[in-house]
């Protein structure tokens, strides 16, 4: 039977995720599911609502068979790097047949057409891209305009400019395009399948329906409490969230990050801040000025934001600074791609999948950290140790956000065992 791969954050697992999981199984006729999941920080540049171990329990109880952690160095990057890291891990398992993802369009073919253009970068497309960048547009905006211009000027594309334009406006379509691009990049045989998303959109804050966005669910929890979102999440998700909240481990207090981030920024010089990915050409001064004129994280981001700098991009950059992941660190780690499978949890089917992965893959399976990381060292020349050290640091920082101070001890990655639902 085919094996299904999904890439997700489960922040938290909700009814829309369950629909996606069931549909994915039906469409692909798969009987086993491998999930690549972000750790304690998500791609938006925020801490997850609850930690990766609780979210792993949710995934297992809701029907996922094996959960592998996406390393931090891919988890808090742009959609392109996020997708590349996760897709590469699925490919490296040597067991996955399908990658199924939710999208606003649900049209795999049109996403493949766009992904192919962006991956191959035909000559005319590259010329348009250079032109728009030289006009001062941000790279994402320049790429979007270049794509539409290329489609308009090219005869053999089976979709209209308007159809392509509609597709690339939606966040899950964009992420799906990046997944397919990554499959092209690594020459994977995994088949991409888009499923049309049900319910409210990605940015919707409505809690009126059974299927709504994770954004709305998180907002509801923070502002109105857990019971306000009960209809939008599965019973097992509700149970686990309730347990975590009662145990003082959630919802995490995001505002506790602000002093650490502001302190880090205020210590930096323009020369130092230029070492971080995407902070150049005067942006370093914008970040530093904002740091000295802001007393909260929200105020800091508002003072940095402009038409070319989105809220999420700024949040990701602030996490890079907090974790001291410089551009050169990313470049060193990017050269070889993901170096390991960090196993967060599995069930009986997942146990069989692990046996197959162990036989077929060149990457090590990590179920216990100590044999692979004797000492946390983010400057290690060993790329596995370097990447794992950032994962450990992110958990150490995350634990400081628990509501109950007694739960905030560090080095949890060495202490918490793999979660088994057997």
From Swiss-Prot:
Keyword presence, Cytoplasm: yes
Main location: cytoplasm
UniProt keyword annotation of tRNA processing present: yes
Reaction(s) the record says it catalyses: cytidine(34) in elongator tRNA(Met) + acetate + ATP = N(4)-acetylcytidine(34) in elongator tRNA(Met) + AMP + diphosphate
GO terms for MF: ATP binding; ligase activity, forming carbon-nitrogen bonds; tRNA binding
Broadest EC class assigned to this enzyme: ligase
InterPro entries (UniProt xref): Rossmann-like_a/b/a_fold, tRNA(Met)_cyd_acetate_ligase
Binding site for ATP: 7-20, 102, 172, 197
Gene Ontology terms describing biological process: tRNA modification
Keywords noted in UniProt: ATP-binding, Cytoplasm, Ligase, Nucleotide-binding, RNA-binding, tRNA processing, tRNA-binding
Domain of life of the source: Bacteria
Cellular component GO terms, alphabetical: cytoplasm
EC number: 6.3.4.-
UniProt subcellular location: Cytoplasm
HAMAP family: TmcAL (MF_01539)
Family, per entry: Belongs to the TmcAL family.
Function: Catalyzes the formation of N(4)-acetylcytidine (ac(4)C) at the wobble position of elongator tRNA(Met), using acetate and ATP as substrates. First activates an acetate ion to form acetyladenylate (Ac-AMP) and then transfers the acetyl group to tRNA to form ac(4)C34.
PANTHER family: TRNA(MET) CYTIDINE ACETATE LIGASE
Protein name, UniProt field: tRNA(Met) cytidine acetate ligase
Higher taxonomy: Bacteria, Bacillati, Bacillota, Clostridia, Halanaerobiales
Gene name tied to this protein: tmcAL
